[in-house]
Amino acid sequence: MEAFDTHTGIGVPLRRSNVDTDQIIPAVYLKRVTRTGFEDGLFAGWRTDPSFILNLEPFNRGTVLVAGPEFGTGSSREHAVWALMDYGFRVVLSSRFGDIFRGNAGKAGLVAGLVGQSDIELLWKLIEQNPGLELTVNLEDRTVTAGTAVVPFEIDDYTRWRLLEGLDDIGLTLRKVDEIAAFEAARPEFKPRTLEPSE
């Protein structure tokens, strides 16, 4: 997973609340067995509307999604996070996330920053008045800068650390390879063990 420190990208105002994971990526797009290639399914039900925000310049090149409250609720599909990332989003800001979505985001490398609703509305206003406005998200300081406005966001310390270090679950496990090997070496012979792959 790529480490995240600071990201600057075009802000996208998604003025919708209660966006569940089925709206983020409908179930019909979940047939792949890989983690990539889901960008076409992102908001598929809405992208048929020519006036949908991601169909408009310059928002179709956005990388910071500023969403309404209750973003990512519903089923626990990781594909919702993968679709956002495949499209190009690095950050999603909302005043409230579905808990499972927020956890999946952090594990995959997508920043899900909690921002007060009044600050979300300020960001919407600034972006809509200045299409193409770039937002800078600083994970170290937990701030979002839009022009001269600076707003704070919340993210738990553990997820923040993982993102700053670029550690997904596999990366965390690989940090413990020596300890795992020492544990396996000390296991009694009569206990089950994982066999080395044969050549």
UniProtKB/Swiss-Prot annotation:
Biological process (GO) annotations held by this record are: L-leucine biosynthetic process
The pathway is: Amino-acid biosynthesis; L-leucine biosynthesis; L-leucine from 3-methyl-2-oxobutanoate: step 2/4
Q: Which GO terms describe its molecular function?
A: 3-isopropylmalate dehydratase activity
Q: Which GO terms describe its cellular component?
A: 3-isopropylmalate dehydratase complex
Q: What class of enzyme is it?
A: lyase
What domain of life does the native source organism fall in? Bacteria
Report which reactions are catalysed by this protein. (2R,3S)-3-isopropylmalate = (2S)-2-isopropylmalate
Assigned EC number: 4.2.1.33
Alphabetic keyword roster: Amino-acid biosynthesis, Branched-chain amino acid biosynthesis, Leucine biosynthesis, Lyase
For the keyword Amino-acid biosynthesis, the answer is yes
Fill in the subunit field for this protein. Heterodimer of LeuC and LeuD.
Similarity annotation: Belongs to the LeuD family. LeuD type 1 subfamily.
Task: Note the HAMAP family from the entry.
Answer: LeuD_type1
Task: Describe the task this protein carries out.
Answer: Catalyzes the isomerization between 2-isopropylmalate and 3-isopropylmalate, via the formation of 2-isopropylmaleate.
PANTHER family, per database record = 3-ISOPROPYLMALATE DEHYDRATASE SMALL SUBUNIT (PTHR43345:SF5), 3-ISOPROPYLMALATE DEHYDRATASE SMALL SUBUNIT 2-RELATED-RELATED (PTHR43345)
- Name used for this protein in its record: 3-isopropylmalate dehydratase small subunit
Q: What is the lineage of its organism?
A: Bacteria, Bacillati, Actinomycetota, Actinomycetes, Mycobacteriales
